Design a protein with these regions (language model features):
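Glycoside hydrolase catalytic-domain context in secreted enzymes
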Residues: 1-243
Length: 243
């Protein structure tokens, strides 16, 4: 975040799905320590580093004045807190499969608009949903996230939910976006980071990619998330024919 700010790049605040946004129910507020602050032995100071994955933030307490001064001199951001717990809540929205069974894009769009309202409330700019892979195998561990085994239903449902999040009731851009995923052929969870989906061009175009095509052309999602698996021997995220 500090690097982005230094280059005047707006922060992207992510929230996972799939049934509405996913946020921490309780949190502690931290206050930024000024660059010219003096060390207070009765106060605990914190800094933090992201893990290699970028998903886990490790908090570190600064217990002595020497380290405190060094970190501030190095330009590190330090924080303090009184450890008061605050609480926040969001709505559990219907899962993708249930939304598709509504057979009503207008209803799905309103659900998306409700998700977008909560995103704006909590400062989320990118929703890591909706998932729209095809229901190929009933044993897929994330089928509940996805809409259907039918690419037309999947595409229209994704387009409707995308429009709901990304546009206001008056049709103007809301300033926040969705992430259609997982592009593409992510139809199993077991060994999904190393599996190889072997698929013909016809099956790819008519079944597995058609929903994404509809969602992109009808609703222009802000983001697309690639999948971990390979397709016909090549990783999806560096597959020239796919991208």
């Amino acid at each position: 975040s500090n690097l982005y700010n230094s280059r005047y790049i707006p922060n992207i605040v992510l929230s996972d799905g799939p049934a509405g946004i996913r946020i921490t129910k309780e949190y502690i507020q931290y206050e930024l320590v000024g660059a010219d602050a003096t060390f207070d032995a009765n106060q605990t100071y914190y800094t933090g580093k992201y893990s290699w994955s970028g998903m886990n933030y490790t908090e570190k307490a600064i217990a002595n004045e020497t380290e405190f001064k060094k970190l501030l001199t190095d330009g590190e951001k330090l924080y303090t807190t009184d450890n008061t717990k605050y609480y926040q809540y969001c709505t559990a929205m219907p899962i993708g499969t249930l939304l598709a069974q509504a057979w009503d894009p207008a209803v799905i769009e309103e659900v998306g608009r409700a998700v977008g309202t909560e995103m704006l409330e909590y400062g989320v700019t990118s929703w890591l949903a909706p998932g729209m892979n095809i229901h190929r195998n009933p044993l897929c561990g994330r089928n509940f996230e996805y809409y259907s085994e039918d690419p037309l239903i999947s595409g229209e449902a994704a387009a409707a939910e995308t429009k709901g999040v990304q546009t206001k009731a008056d049709g103007t851009y809301s300033g926040i976006g969705v992430t259609l995923k997982h592009f593409a052929f992510n139809n199993q969870e077991q060994q999904r980071m190393g599996s190889n989906s072997v698929v013909s061009e016809r099956a790819a175009r008519e079944i597995y990619l058609k929903g994404f095509e509809i969602g992109v052309e009808e609703a222009q999602p802000d983001y697309i998330m690639s999948s971990y698996n390979m397709v016909n021997g090549y990783p999806t995220f560096e597959n020239y024919g796919l991208l």
